[in-house]
Amino acid sequence: MRWTPNKVTALRVVVGFVAVALFGHGTWANLAAVVLTVAAIALDALDGYLARSKHMATPLGAQIDILGDRMIENMFFTYFAVVGMVSLWLPVLFFARGAATDFLRGLAVKAGHSGWGANAMLPAWWGRALVASRWSRGLYAALKCACFCYLGLELALTRGPVALLGTVASETHLTIRTIAQILTWSTAAFCLLRGLPVLIEGWKLFAPEAVAVRARKSPAEAA
């Protein structure tokens, strides 16, 4: 079978689903889920590498890759929110940010804009650096991987009747929880930061059109 970026993305989502399904089913299942989490993040890098090196990058493939990212993010953060390890507002934030940016990207594509070149939705260098550069995508993937794996290890080591560390001292537990909070909210902050260029450029693209439509409606409404 010939592997394509889209097939790798589909495999990544399946691996993510299996990882989340394993969490909460005992220490060794939790550890296996952590390994699968690393594999899912690695597959994210692999589909991008295939697209670039094999010249398989397409607008549809880019949208499928983004869809895979959203599914992975929402699956993991929703699970950890349900079991009380992160704030419920965290998956809400990721979902809202993803819905807003994906909506604007869809409008931009429909209006004839692309993700690159002279007709790109993000013409400013700082927007491309935050959203599309390799360092930004790599850092974001690393933050998510560290966040998901840390929470998974915490689940395996300190929670459940067969936790590897059993009952830990309150000071140790507080330290573990503090690190988890720093990791999760740092990931959320970088997620919002990467979404800002899309929101700003989307507003610049479509706000004038919305004003024009409203202006055309006003005389008709007055009549």
Predicted features by range, described:
Residues 19-30:
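Short, hydrophobic transmembrane alpha-helix segments
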Residues 57-62, 68-69:
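Aspartate-rich (DDxxD/NDxxD/DxxxD) Mg2+/diphosphate-binding motifs
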Residues 30-38:
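Structural signature of hydrophobic alpha-helical transmembrane segments
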